[in-house]
């Protein structure tokens, strides 16, 4: 079983190595600030969101398309921490 410490390291690396620079900055900035504070359920949500394609995620962040219900809570948490514009 993966330890919390290993999981956090894996998520941090994954956050900074996305498919697009925009998503690197969004996810990377968020995990640098808040990753240690997330509980197991929030980490699950973050991991599920990060499993989506960047081309789908970016429009959710910018409000160009509707966010799937499964990702709303974690996306709102990230948006509360990151200023896009």
Question: What residue ranges belong to the model's regions?
Answer:
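Positively charged, polar, low-complexity stretches
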Residues: 2-85
